[in-house]
Amino acid sequence: MNKNKESLHLSSPAINTHMNKRSQIWAAFRSAFPYTIPIFAGFLFLGIAYGIFMHSLGFSAIYPIIMSFMIFAGSMEFVAANFLLGAFNPMNALFLTLMVNARHLFYGISMLDKYRGTGKKKLYLIFGMCDESFSINYTANVPANVDKGWFMFFVTLLNHLYWVAGAAIGGIFGSYVKFNTEGLDFVMTALFIVIFIEQWMKEKKHYSALTGLGLSVASLILFGGNQFIIPAMLAILGVLTVLRKPLEKAEVSV
């Protein structure tokens, strides 16, 4: 009897540790989910549009489902659909993918500190990073009692699942849709406008936002609508790196 009591007593710390870990994971999920609700609306509509688009090209539902799960890069998935219809040209696909998604290089640099200490979750966080997940994970004020690694993991996972679900719905039920889906992609543009406004409202002074906006407009004028993103991000990264300390002092002094 005493041995049983001793074994229960010895195992209780392990049980408590397991329960604490589960509660931490659940708390991170509950904190992350509300942030992803706007993404759910955008990804669902855009994912459905992508699934319908793939169906219109003659692909079965399995194609948008697998591509949305494995690629998870909205704009490139639309481009990849056309690659599947043309001659096999892997180098062209490689360079076009790098050009379209080169902004992720800057996302990765920005998230180096935030991803530090996340353990094995880092691999999925890197794979699943998209514009929307980056925006949330970089700007969200995570509560002190919530594990930031699990918070970022669930933000990334939920956004990924939303996109796959939308693509699956569009691919499966695409043959039943008879309305014109042109313009559905504007949902994501509207979403980024909302994210920008929220970030603007959080800042006491808007130096960084105005810098990003001004440099983006200048790059758009100089390089045109198809090639302005990379120059704009390089300019923003350089200017904000040089002015980082003055900007931080200005924010603190307010």
Curated annotation (Swiss-Prot):
Q: What are its GO biological-process terms? A: L-valine transmembrane transport
Q: How does it sit in the membrane?
A: Multi-pass membrane protein
Q: Work out whether the entry's keyword set contains S-adenosyl-L-methionine.
A: no
Predominant localisation class: membrane
Database matches in InterPro entries: Brnchd-chn_aa_trnsp_AzlC, Brnchd-chn_aa_trnsp_permease
Which compartment or compartments is the protein found in? Cell membrane
* Cellular component annotations (GO), alphabetically ordered: plasma membrane
The entry's function note states: Involved in branched-chain amino acid transport.
Task: Return the similarity comment.
Answer: Belongs to the AzlC family.
Q: What PANTHER family does this protein map onto?
A: INNER MEMBRANE PROTEIN YGAZ (PTHR34979:SF1)
Q: From the Swiss-Prot or TrEMBL record, give the protein name.
A: Branched-chain amino acid transport protein AzlC
Q: What is the primary gene name for this protein? A: azlC
